[in-house]
Amino acid sequence: MNRNEHYDPSLVTGFGIRLAWATLEMMTDDVKDLQLLVSGSQDDVDDLRISVENGRLSVSQPAYGLSTRIATERWMQVTLRIPRDWRGDVQASTMTGLMQVHGLSGTDFSLTTVSGTLRVNGLSGMSVTLHTVSGLLDVCGITAEKGSMRTVSGDLSLYRGIFRQLKLTSVSGMIVAGLDEAFEALDINTVSGAMSVQAPIMRAKIGLRSVAGKLKTEGVENTEDGPAISANSVSGSLTVTRSGSPAASDAT
């Protein structure tokens, strides 16, 4: 069953989306209306609650364990096609479903999954928060004043990032951060995962607090001035590489 809803984008200032196992995709497109497209079984589509109140588009799905219709195989796709000039705040979460975001611009973004992969390709906002527990966090082409990305056991990969302040956190997952511009402050925290930073900087104030991990720099001088990189870990090591250095070229 398919369900298609259309909204005037000037009347929608934000999204509030809470899904259980459904897949969520949000993308900008050459459209005039804000389009909500849902595909799945009739029962599951009927279970979806959709409303617009006080300028906020809300989409919610019953949690898997609370649904009155539990099946062994279930599939539902929720897609938002958004006009390219739309700006607003976005709060979206899934439990096990994949979440994909393409080309969105807005104010504040909060995107969360439990075990589903969170994949972002093109995002611009004032504040961006990305969080997953065991899912992969795969981010490319993101610009924000402040950013916070957190995983527990999943790996965190960031490429082509532009931030003023950024915080990256993982317990056992590996953290890879590729930044396109110099930044003000970068805070990295892991327990056992390795940490790697690549940025177009020649010097930085780098601090690593670790029991067993080690600090390695390639083309970056560790000084008392410049962007601040603060890392904390039990056993994870930190590598900081200047973009364009031989080590950075070898890594790509």
What are these model-predicted stretches?
Residues E5-H6, V139-T252:
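Short, surface-exposed interaction patches in beta-rich subdomains
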Residues L11, A20, E53, R74-M76, ...:
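Repetitive beta-strand solenoid architecture
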Residues G14, D33-Q35, D47, D89, ...:
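Exposed beta-strand and adjacent loop surfaces of beta-rich binding modules
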Residues F15-I17, A92, L111, L130, ...:
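Active-site alpha-helical segments that house and flank conserved acidic catalytic motifs
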Residues T68-T72:
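Glycine/small-residue-rich loop that forms an oxyanion/phosphate-binding "nest" at active or ligand-binding sites
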